[in-house]
Curated annotation (Swiss-Prot):
UniProt topology in membrane: Peripheral membrane protein
Subcellular localization, as worded in the UniProt entry: Cell inner membrane; Cytoplasm
Keywords: ATP-binding, Cell inner membrane, Cell membrane, Cytoplasm, Membrane, Metal-binding, Nucleotide-binding, Protein transport, Translocase, Translocation, Transport, Zinc
Residues involved in ATP binding: 87, 105-109, 512
Function: Part of the Sec protein translocase complex. Interacts with the SecYEG preprotein conducting channel. Has a central role in coupling the hydrolysis of ATP to the transfer of proteins into and across the cell membrane, serving both as a receptor for the preprotein-SecB complex and as an ATP-driven molecular motor driving the stepwise translocation of polypeptide chains across the membrane.
Subunit structure comment from the entry: Monomer and homodimer. Part of the essential Sec protein translocation apparatus which comprises SecA, SecYEG and auxiliary proteins SecDF-YajC and YidC.
EC number(s) on file: 7.4.2.8
Protein name as it appears in the record: Protein translocase subunit SecA
Induction of its expression: Repressed under conditions of excess protein secretion capacity and derepressed when protein secretion becomes limiting. This is regulated by SecM.
């Protein structure tokens, strides 16, 4: 009842917004005849007129109807394609910072040209975000003629591009690229030493294609730039040898820490826990291998790393499966994306898991990496002034889009009525029975000349179906998502009569399956083609198209339900595009991962009680409902994980923003002389008062230790005793000022020897290098804190609040250490070392035009809300 009520509310909300948008569509339609009358030159001149109007104070919303009418007319002339009204609706939604749900085949690529053109007019840049390099290149090449006709520049940002190519791409009005590349470029830009090394401009408008995949499926995977850490490959090998001696906890043992096994597995959270028995056994083995001292515990602070290695090894063996979670190729472990089924060369699991899997598979173990910079997609895309997205499946995730990104989801109606038949699920007891039924369904479709797309959840499942088809000599294509361009070509022709295509989750996503095959792809095979040949190909295509339509269109077979209903809908959505006929059916078994882990025991008991014969399936609404409930459980759990990840990352994100902001100010400044003087004053004062109490005279001062401190840490030999002898009534305030003045004179004398220009260069480089080094260490420390913070819950403390408090304290300490390290280094540097230092860092030296001065009344960058002068002084 409540669900129906909420559905009605959201449905009404969608209809109300569409009603408003349709009024704008009418305005666009009214302008169509006016733009049809314009010549090409007059049409092209509109872009500069729009820009002038924006400079004079009009908004993007003010010029939207005219801009969209212009793009529609330009598209008719350049592509011979007219934007449908539903595509105009989609364009309006995307400009209003919404998620536009547009079904497969509704023309999302053409729709994107509308908001992309409009938002590029202000000159701040538009980033169109795709899932892979192939789609970025394809869409850029496809839409460039239209944008260039309208006077806009288009850039392409791909991995492995040179600095100059990237810089040019980002300076374009519209830039195409992948989510990974945009994110990594942002991180790299915040690691440079001069403004000239940055490639990105200020982040203005992001238009994300397949937005559900990028902002939800990949939200749990942070982007990380890392550097090599110490070599510990031998330790991974030794720990790997322990795993065969450990036995898994029996499922009936309810207590994960007790029982007859050595470890327990939580498949839902993909975690492993040692039992008391397992702990004793592991400790004994480690004693025998001399990896741990007798009498110590794995839980001792100095053995935490060993415990981490043991758990990583167990996870590698018991939770990560070859050809499902990863492949082994060319002596390397290559991750398989759990959502797309695509391999991800170059990506590595963190926290030592990747090394543990390399040890398990007996391939060369690469060194662990230390994080230099990281950000989640959630926080990266929230940096944009405006963000919008398109996908065929967003409605089931509308709450998450709204709560995390503040984006409304608008379901755009289809241009033609959807007539695909979605048959009920068939549920079998065993995997073998299910596969038999799938093969029979495929054979039936072949007899009808009906094309089939078989969707699987992993490469391993694809290969099982493929082997069964090979036994029967049935020709088919298998897409394991290794080559994006090739997979798109195969998917494009998956609508040919009788063709059988097996694909993992989202292989080929972004490419339409046209009934009868893709005519455009077929024509592009020929370089020099006669009009007679074109007619011949078109006639053949029409014949095959009609044959497929009469056979029932594209038939979708799902080999099991995915964890998310959305991914099931994506698979179904490959059929029935633009009002085409089509059908879909999911085949399930009680051995499927979803059913085994998340479905209730009631279903299992009911299936057993029915006493089904071999190869007999159950088809019942009650079972379908139970499966949906299992999916909802997983969706809710995954949402909670993503939300929690964001809550924790928000803490470090505030610190990251503060550090990057300060770092950029340092880079953009001509010199930081005034800032260095303030830091000197602050650091010296904080160190002096440790030995000179407030409101005291010299008889209460620890002069000997103070002199040692100043000499050792700051290379400062201040004549404090002489000052006291000359002026016995010196107050604490006067002596502090005198020491600071002495240090300043000392520094100025050093500057004369080294040279002012050289000193300014050294100050900036030291500041940046020290900041980067400490930030790297801070990220590692916070990561360790994050991993163990959940244990605070056992002490009746809120882990999130504890994490916020401790990470803030760590950040504050890092800032204090930064100032100390900078002052200490600059105090010690001499003229001969200064020359060597500059020679070593010549590649970092850039001069600028403006001087940076930090206001003491500005808010402190640490996020405390206090002024600089009351919190972290001059920094």
């Amino acid at each position: 009842m409540l669900i129906q009520f909420l559905t009605k509310i959201f449905s009404n909300h969608n209809n109300r917004i569409l009603k408003k948008f349709k009024k704008i569509v009418l305005s666009v339609n009214k302008l169509e005849k006016n733009f049809e009358k314009l010549s090409d030159k007059e049409l092209q001149a509109q872009t500069e007129l729009f820009r002038l109007r924006l400079r004079n104070g009009e908004t993007l919303d003010d010029i939207l109807p005219e801009a969209f009418a212009l793009v529609r007319e330009a598209s008719k002339r350049v592509f011979s394609m007219r934007h449908f009204d539903v595509q105009i609706l989609g364009g309006i939604a995307l400009n209003k910072q919404c998620i536009a749900e547009m079904r497969t085949g509704e023309g999302k690529t053409l729709t994107s040209t509308l908001p992309a053109y409009l938002n590029a007019l202000n000159g701040k840049g538009v980033h169109i975000v795709t899932m892979n390099d192939y789609l970025a290149r394809r869409d850029a090449e496809k839409n460039t003629p239209l944008f260039e006709f309208l006077g806009l520049t288009v850039g392409l940002n791909l991995s492995e591009m040179s600095f100059f190519s990237k810089r040019k791409a980002y300076l374009s009005d519209i830039t195409y690229g992948t989510n990974n590349e945009y994110g990594f470029d942002y991180l790299r830009d915040n690691m440079v030493f001069s403004p000239e090394e940055r490639v990105q401009r200020k982040l203005n408008y992001a238009l994300v294609d397949e937005v559900d995949s990028i902002l939800i499926d990949e939200a749990r995977t942070p982007l990380i730039i890392s550097g090599p850490s110490e070599d510990s490959s031998e330790l991974y090998k030794e720990i790997n040898k322990i795993v065969p001696f450990l036995n898994s906890q029996k499922k009936e043992d309810s207590d994960i820490f007790c029982g007859t096994g050595d470890f327990s597995i939580d498949e839902k959270s993909k975690q492993i826990y040692l039992t008391e028995r397992g702990l004793i056994k592991v400790e004994k083995i480690l004693f025998d291998k001399k990896l741990m001292n007798t009498g110590e515990s794995l839980y001792s602070s100095n053995n935490i790393i060993l415990m981490h290695h043991v758990l990583s090894a167990l996870r590698a063996h018991k939770l990560f499966v070859r050809n499902v979670d990863y492949l082994v190729k060319d002596n390397s472990v290559i991750i398989v994306d759990e959502h797309t089924g695509r391999t991800m060369p170059g990506r590595r699991w963190s926290d030592g898991l990747h090394q543990a899997i390399e040890a398990k598979e007996n391939v060369s173990i690469k060194n662990e990496n230390q994080t230099l910079a990281s950000i989640t997609f959630q926080n990266y895309f929230r940096l944009y002034e405006k963000i919008a997205g398109m996908t065929g499946t967003a409605e089931t995730e509308s709450f998450e889009f709204n709560s995390i990104y503040n984006l409304d989801t608008i379901v755009i109606p289809t241009n033609r009525k959807m007539i695909r038949k979605d048959f009920p699920d068939l549920v079998y007891m065993t995997e073998k029975e299910k596969i038999n039924a799938i093969i029979q369904d495929i054979q039936k479709c072949i007899k009808l000349n009906q094309p089939v797309l078989v969707g699987t959840v992993s490469i391993e499942k694809s290969e099982i179906i493929s082997k069964e088809l090979l036994k029967l000599n049935i020709n088919h294509n298998v897409l394991n998502a290794k080559f994006h361009a090739k997979e798109a070509e195969i998917i494009a022709q998956a609508g040919k009569p009788g063709s059988i295509t097996i694909a993992t989750n989202m292989a080929g996503r972004g490419t339409d399956i046209v009934l009868g095959g893709n005519l455009e792809v077929e024509l592009n095979k020929y370089k020099n083609i006669t009009s007679r040949k074109i007619e011949e190909i078109k006639k053949k295509w029409q014949s095959e198209h009609d044959l497929v339509v009469s056979a029932g269109g594209l038939h979708i077979i799902g080999t099991e339900r995915h964890e998310s209903r959305r991914i099931d809908n994506q698979l179904r959505g490959r059929s029935g595009r633009q009002g085409d006929t089509g059908s879909s059916r999911f085949y399930l078994s009680m051995e499927d991962s979803l059913m085994r882990i998340f479905a209730s025991d009631k279903i299992v008991h009911m299936m057993k009680k029915l006493g089904l014969a071999f190869n007999e399936a159950i088809e019942h609404s009650w079972v379908t409902k139970a499966i949906e409930n299992a999916q909802k459980k997983v969706e809710n759990r995954n949402f909670d994980i993503r939300k929690q990840l964001l809550e924790y990352d928000d803490v470090i994100n505030e610190q990251r923003s503060a550090i990057y902001s300060q770092r950029n100010k340092l880079i953009d400044a001509r010199d930081i002389k005034l800032m260095i003087y303030d830091i000197f004053k602050d650091v010296l004062k904080k160190n002096i008062i440790l030995y000179i109490p407030k409101n005291t005279f010299h008889d209460k001062w620890n002069v000997t230790d103070l002199k040692d401190k100043l000499n050792i840490d700051f290379y400062l030999n201040a004549p404090i005793l002489d000052w006291i002898n000359i002026e016995p009534n010196l107050t604490d305030k006067k002596i502090i000022k005198r020491i600071i003045d002495f240090a300043r004179i000392n520094y100025k004398n050093k500057e004369i020897l080294i040279g002012s220009n050289n000193m300014r260069i050294i100050e900036k480089i030291i500041m940046l290098q020290t900041l980067d080094s400490l930030w790297k260490e801070h990220l590692a420390a916070v990561d360790y804190l994050r991993q163990g913070i959940h244990l605070r819950g056992y002490a009746q403390k809120d882990p999130k609040q504890e994490y916020k408090r401790e990470s803030f304290n760590m950040f504050s300490s890092m800032l204090e250490l930064l100032k100390f390290e900078v002052v200490s280094f600059l105090s010690r540097i001499n003229s001969s070392y200064a020359k060597k230092y500059i020679d070593l860092n010549k590649h970092l030296v850039i001069t600028h035009n403006n001087t940076m001065k930090i206001s003491r009344n500005s808010p402190c960058l640490c996020g405390s809300g206090k002024k600089y002068k009351y919190c972290h002084g001059s920094l």
